[in-house]
Amino acid sequence: MSLFPAYEIFARQLQDTGILSDAWVDGRPRFRLQGVVLSLAQAHALKRAAERIGAIYQELIDLLWGHPEWLDTFFGLTPYQKLMWLSAQGRWHGIARADLFLCRDGRVQCCEVNSDTPSGEAEAVLLNRLLHPYHGDVHDPNRGLASAFWRMLVTSHGGRQPRTVGVVYPTELPEDLSMIAIYRQWLEARGCQVVLGSPYNLHACRAGVAMFGEPLDLVIRHYKTDWWGEREVVWTDAAPYRDPDPLEGPLRLLLEAEYNGHVTVVNPFGAVVTQNKLSLALMWEAIERFSPLARRWIRRYIPATYRLTQMTLDDVANHRQMWVLKSAYGCEGDETVCGPYVSDEEWRDTLASALPEFWICQRFFSVAPEPNGRNPNYGVYLVGGRSAGFYTRLSVAATDEEAITAPTYVVRRGI
């Protein structure tokens, strides 16, 4: 293994890609140059787990399609969330990221799957590419991510290559600009015209739907499903959203164009259900409705998860070390509270403030840390149902905004 470059030199190399320019956050390095190197057995176990978890979600979708009453009785979806689900007709997947952990006892556990607007692709691909020469004879598992992404888009588009692709994202937020940029690079390399904009830039045209005057064949939707629908607060003491109403005009325009076969949307709006963490609770609360194989995989990979409404609050309050609280659509570090990492007071305050119908309780599991004590979160990209790469973040406790990203490699030989 070669000596790593100085971080400032690496940061300039990163900037030279034209994709990633923010190598620091609040003065701290965002990245670790030393990669995580997985054994063949570890990589296989993680990839296999991600694909099996994807299959569990597909079975959940099939179950829910046969039990539409669960949209109300279990998920409590809003009218526009139900519109998204029903319009998608069971379609939910294009690209997802399963966040997996290797535990001290050897298990692989999945805390959640981002099936709606997964991010990190730029960091995963570019870090691996730039730092590969410093890691000796290892395999870069992210080399094929761009090709897998393209094959998925073509398949989603009925086997036809899209000509004009609109990438719809929250243009006022900078967090995922690198991902938008690398998507654009991948698509333009395939000969596509790429148009960037927000839902408010969509408009009707003779061909179906357009953005800035350009008719679109395909839309990559990097705008969360819970932002397209009605916005709901999840805390008893939270002020209502200033913009709680659904994006009715853009949403109806896109759904109608897709229904009429004028545009393909990836990820499909059916992700409004799979992204909802109550889906994890459904796996456990209705486990007997799943196939025997899916039951075995749920017990193997998904920590016991239940709706907070089904729990005895005093029992949860008194067993902080056993549980993690998560809101239905919250992100890591945002509306996720790990019992072992907070005080008794913070835990009880969370339970007192949380609106139970929007929360789940998930069993805490102990992660096998790296030698330096950080906990690796192995994000496995699932593209068209197949594992296609890794996005690894290292954190002191739960994965949050202070986690650092490291390249991920796999040994070429050995165990």
Report residues per predicted region.
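Preference for protein termini
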Residues: 1-415
